[in-house]
């Protein structure tokens, strides 16, 4: 397992298309943050999805939950913008050096997704997309980040020199695929929690509550599509049950599919997951297109 992670971390994977560095010249020390558009043929008349790969907030599964997803969306007539956001790094997963140094942690990740939403909307005309049909899809920890963008859109974390955003930071829809949700209790995914909050932050009940998605569903939460699998060995399947209940209690339009099999980390693969769980791809496309009929 560790060898596989090391390979994924060290491999140089370059997405196709023009890569943009949204923090360029802004002194955020975030040169590794990149966004790459994958535009459909009729790009101005279809939704756009910002894709957030998973990786426990320590690394990014850039291939299986990033590039392949963006290409799949584009090939199905949906624009994609692949976001490579800041993570704690694989080193922090092994050596716990953030006991001594800040490293990467919250709010770095939500800064990156908000900066991406802002950049894409402000540059929608030159990018060739519709800024009013812009959503976010995330996998595992990326699903937590996608939901965070919906839950905290009224707080501008970007702190740009020109001031608060004049465009909405709220995504128009969210796809949460086998997401991390809660930071509390027996169902919390501890590695993601540590990646997000830091070595000291995990001991703070205030910080755990602050980043537990189920505690922060806003009145204006956009529609949510969510799936996971009962046999998930990585992120306990109750995370999505918790989110489903929170969305239901808040009256948020959403679709939740719980598959019996499929495990975790299958993305849009034709190989990984199960025949049952791979149905999520068609279900998502039907759901998304239904939002704009």
Where are these regions (language model features)?
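Short beta-strand element of the alpha/beta-hydrolase
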Residues: 46-54
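Short beta-strand/loop motif that positions the catalytic acidic residue
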Residues: 220, 226-228, 232
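C-terminal catalytic histidine-bearing segment of alpha/beta-hydrolase fold enzymes
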Residues: 93-96, 227, 237, 241-293
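Catalytic nucleophile-loop/oxyanion-hole region of alpha/beta-hydrolase
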Residues: 61-68, 84-131, 272-277
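Primarily recognizes the serine-hydrolase "nucleophile elbow" in alpha/beta-hydrolase
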Residues: 115-189, 208
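N-terminal cap/lid segment of alpha/beta-hydrolase-fold proteins
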Residues: 9-43, 107
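Acidic catalytic loop of the alpha/beta-hydrolase fold
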Residues: 183, 231-235
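Mobile cap/lid helix-loop segments that gate and shape the active-site cleft of serine hydrolases
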Residues: 25, 163, 179-216, 222
